[in-house]
Amino acid sequence: MSLIVVRTHSFILFWFSCCWRVCFIQWIRKYSIPMADMGRRDSASALLDASENKNHLWG
């Protein structure tokens, strides 16, 4: 009887940890990737501004 209880609890714990991990990864992707894209966009716009300034200085 105790073996059945242990297996059931370990099975429930396994599924809970899997679901938690999937939800956590999705949360990380949802909130960290837009920040990274924003950073990339900012650096790209900074490079564009720098090239425009260089073209403006050279004529």
From Swiss-Prot:
The keyword Disulfide bond applies. Its main location: secreted. It is found in: Secreted. The keyword Signal applies. Expressed by the venom gland. Contains 1 disulfide bond. One of its GO terms (molecular function) is toxin activity. Keywords: Disulfide bond, Secreted, Signal, Toxin. GO terms for cellular component: extracellular region. It comes from the Eukaryota. Belongs to the scoloptoxin-23 family. This is U-scoloptoxin(23)-Er2a. The lineage of its organism: Eukaryota, Metazoa, Ecdysozoa, Arthropoda, Myriapoda.
